[in-house]
Amino acid sequence: MREAENDDMIVPQLNASVDDVEDMDIYDSTGRKIAEVEAVVIDGTGTVRGLVIEHGGLLGIGSREAILEIGDVQLKDGRLVVNMTEEQLPSLPEWRK
């Protein structure tokens, strides 16, 4: 898997472009911000498979990048929402470029 380089590419599951999705905040079901999107990840065929998210730490210090499967994310009222808590994010696979 690799990061999508075409900012105009549409993420069909979210009906938004890569450029729109990158840097969006991710919220839990209670409306609490728990992460931020760093990149969209695609497979060898160009199919969107997930999002690279940054979570934990303070102001980027001590934070971690992980892969969040695209099926775990929904766009609701202009926000990316997951049915996970901040405490569950460390169990996600780490992103390695």
Question: Residues of each region from the PLM?
Answer:
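Peripheral interaction segments used for macromolecular assembly
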Residues: 1-97
